[in-house]
Amino acid sequence: MKLQLMICLVLLPCFFCEPDEICRARMTNKEFTYKSNVCNNCGDQVAACEAECFRNDVYTACHEAQKG
């Protein structure tokens, strides 16, 4: 779990709640990178793009670390 949390903190700003328009733009683009894949666990604001973000292993590890 500590390793997952470290990966999360180093590669993905989990605390950053992106605006809806950015989320929608990334959903349209369908091309995710470490820098742009900043979906988070902030609630309904990003619910629409969380399914896409889960395709990224780093985000998945981050999400699991947040839950744990």
From Swiss-Prot:
A GO CC annotation given for this chain: extracellular region
Keywords for this protein: Amidation, Disulfide bond, Secreted, Signal, Toxin
Subcellular localization, as worded in the UniProt entry: Secreted
Expression (tissue specificity): Expressed by the venom gland.
Span of the signal peptide: 1-17
Coiled-coil regions listed in the entry: none
Molecular function per GO: toxin activity
PTM-bearing positions, type Lysine amide: 67
Disulfide bonds: 23-53, 39-49, 42-62
Further information: Arose via modification of ancestral neuropeptide hormones (ion transport peptide/crustacean hyperglycemic hormones (ITP/CHH)).
Family per similarity comment: Belongs to the helical arthropod-neuropeptide-derived (HAND) family.
Record comment regarding domains: Comprises exclusively 4 tightly packed alpha helices (no beta strand is present).
Function: Toxin that paralyzes insects. May have a direct effect on the insect central nervous system.
Name of the molecule in the record: U1-agatoxin-Ta1b
Organism: Eratigena agrestis (Hobo spider)
Highest classification ranks of the organism: Eukaryota, Metazoa, Ecdysozoa, Arthropoda, Chelicerata
